[in-house]
């Protein structure tokens, strides 16, 4: 049974501009340590921004699927996006983001945009 769905679209250039303006202050506030470490494999600043844009979209899609928003008991860092050994995107949850049910995540990007779609189900 589907408990919730969420989708979010993020402009990679917007994330790139936020990183340029705020640097680690932005990434440390929004992303988990693992997400930040995973981003270090990208030497190109735009590729790194694309990595973060997809994860930001996934976090937003997840809270939309919950029917909440950030700051209502769920913080962005409570949601960590990574890939399983086969490359499938996964969400790990901590703190206020922990909820009953299973999470399915799909992410993609094209040009300057990243999109994520989340379903919560029993």
UniProtKB/Swiss-Prot annotation:
GO terms for biological process: fatty acid biosynthetic process; lysine biosynthetic process via aminoadipic acid. It is found in: Cytoplasm. Pfam families: ACPS (PF01648). Keywords: Cytoplasm, Fatty acid biosynthesis, Fatty acid metabolism, Lipid biosynthesis, Lipid metabolism, Magnesium, Metal-binding, Transferase. It catalyses: apo-[ACP] + CoA = holo-[ACP] + adenosine 3',5'-bisphosphate + H(+). Mg(2+) binds at residues 8, 60. GO terms for molecular function: holo-[acyl-carrier-protein] synthase activity; magnesium ion binding. InterPro entries: 4-PPantetheinyl_Trfase_dom, 4-PPantetheinyl_Trfase_dom_sf, ACPS, P-Pant_transferase_sf, Ppantetheine-prot_Trfase_dom. It comes from the Bacteria. Transmembrane segments: none annotated. Belongs to the P-Pant transferase superfamily. AcpS family. Transfers the 4'-phosphopantetheine moiety from coenzyme A to a Ser of acyl-carrier-protein. This is Holo-[acyl-carrier-protein] synthase. The lineage of its organism: Bacteria, Pseudomonadati, Pseudomonadota, Alphaproteobacteria, Rickettsiales.
């Amino acid at each position: 049974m589907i408990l919730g769905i969420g989708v979010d679209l993020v402009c990679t250039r917007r994330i790139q501009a936020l990183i340029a303006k705020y640097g680690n202050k932005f990434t440390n506030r929004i992303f988990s340590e693992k997400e930040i470490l995973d981003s270090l494999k990208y030497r190109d600043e735009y590729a790194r921004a694309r990595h973060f844009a997809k994860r930001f979209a996934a976090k937003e899609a997840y809270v939309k699927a919950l029917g909440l928003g950030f700051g209502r008991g769920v913080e962005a860092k409570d949601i960590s996006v990574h890939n399983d050994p086969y490359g499938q995107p996964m969400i790990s949850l901590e703190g206020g983001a922990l909820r009953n049910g299973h999470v399915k995540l799909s992410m993609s990007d094209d040009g300057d945009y990243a999109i994520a779609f989340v379903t919560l189900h029993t």
